[in-house]
Structures are given as C-alpha cells and as structure tokens.
C-alpha cells in the first residue's frame, strides 16, 4: 500500500514548523496502524523546483497526453499521485490559502487522461486513492470558507477520491501563551483521525 505525503511545510521555523508537527503526529499514528504502508514523500524542495505551466508547456503536455505518452517526465507528479492508495497533504495557512508552490503542484497533478477524464455526463476521477487528508495550521482561527480546505475537498471530487478529511490547527498567533495547548489539541486530533483510517 502506497502512502503519498505531499510536504509543503515551507516555514521560517524550519524543523519547528507547526504544520510539519501536525503531519508528524498524523503520519506516526497512520504508519503504526498500517506498518505495511510504503511512504513516498514530495519534499518542499521538490515542490519549489516545479515550474508553473506557460503556454508552451501546456501545448507540449497536451500533445503528449493526446499521444498517450504518460510516461514522459512532465507527468511524473501526476502518475505518482494517481497511483497512491492514500494521500496526505500538509501546508501552512498562508494569505487565506496556502503557499504558491502547492498551487503549482496541483497544476502538475491535474492531468487529463491520467488523474481524471471527461465523459458526456461530466468529469470522472481516475486516481486510486481511497482518501486524502489535508493538514494545515495558521495564526488565525479557522473560517468556514477556508480556501485550502475547500479547494482540496473539490479536488478530491475531481480526482475521484471518495473520502476527504482535514485538521486545521488555528489561532496559533492570537495568544502565544495558548499556542502549545492549541498545537497539542490539533496533534491529538490528527493522531485520532489516523486511527480511524
């Protein structure tokens, strides 16, 4: 069983990244429950190396897709995502959304004919993952219309991933005295979630 971890924990805190701590809590519990899982990680460095698609790149990718050349390197991220049995995405809550590097990654995995396709009744997902978990943290409290959460929920529908779950560690910069307790609570939620999947 292949577990894909998309690590977009870009942070000035380095190893003290709060989003990464949330991810560690989830992954530890998940791997304890599923010791057979093969963990594959897309690192922050790999994400930052991805280029956003310009017109030339889009035309090249479309030409490759039409010829069925999905083994080309431009589809590497999409193939990896499509073949994962479970996906964890971790990214901080930046500017009411998430880091730009994650949006570029989404461009790379959104490949018609590989991660989804069209039929007369609309779009159908082609990814084999049964669930995707989105982990995020932010200085502000969670809002009902948090873009990161909404976007990944919609992407799961696009990719045919039936179950979407998330943990939002929020309010971390409101009162520094409360931050440790808030993080502890969020990590406990992530741990508990992993035990149910």
Residue ranges, per PLM feature:
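N-terminal beta1-alpha1-beta2 submodule of the flavodoxin-like/Rossmannoid cofactor-binding fold
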Residues: 1-91, 96-100, 104-107, 189-197
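Flexible, glycine-rich phosphate/dinucleotide-binding loops
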Residues: 12-13, 48, 141, 173-175
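Short, glycine-/small-residue-rich phosphate/pyrophosphate-handling segment
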Residues: 118-161
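A conditional alpha-helix N-cap/helix-loop micro-motif detector
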Residues: 67-70, 114, 183
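Glycine-rich phosphate/pyrophosphate-binding loop and the adjoining helix
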Residues: 143-197
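Cofactor-binding loop segments of dinucleotide-utilizing enzymes, especially the Rossmann-like FAD-
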Residues: 8, 44, 136-137, 169
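Hydrophobic/aromatic-lined pockets within catalytic cores
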Residues: 27, 31, 110, 114, ...
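Conserved nucleotide-sugar donor-interacting segment of glycosyltransferase catalytic cores
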Residues: 106-121
């Amino acid at each position: 069983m292949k577990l894909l971890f998309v690590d977009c924990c870009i942070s000035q805190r380095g190893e003290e990244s709060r989003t990464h701590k949330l991810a560690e809590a989830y992954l530890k519990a998940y791997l304890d429950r599923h010791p057979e899982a093969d963990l594959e990680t897309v690192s922050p460095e790999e994400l930052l190396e991805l280029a956003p698609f310009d017109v030339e790149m889009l035309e090249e990718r479309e030409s490759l897709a039409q010829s069925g050349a999905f083994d080309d390197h431009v589809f590497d991220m999409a193939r990896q995502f499509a073949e994962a049995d479970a996906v964890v995405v971790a990214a901080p809550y930046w500017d009411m959304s998430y880091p730009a590097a994650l949006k570029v990654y989404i461009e790379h995995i959104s490949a018609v004919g590989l991660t989804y396709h069209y039929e007369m009744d609309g779009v159908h997902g082609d990814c084999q993952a049964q669930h995707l978990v989105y982990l995020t943290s932010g200085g502000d409290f969670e809002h009902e219309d948090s873009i990161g959460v909404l976007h990944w929920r919609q992407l799961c529908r696009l990719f045919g991933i039936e179950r979407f779950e998330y943990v939002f560690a929020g309010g971390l910069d409101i009162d520094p005295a409360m931050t440790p307790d808030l993080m502890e609570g969020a990590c406990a939620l992530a741990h508990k979630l992993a035990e149910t999947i």
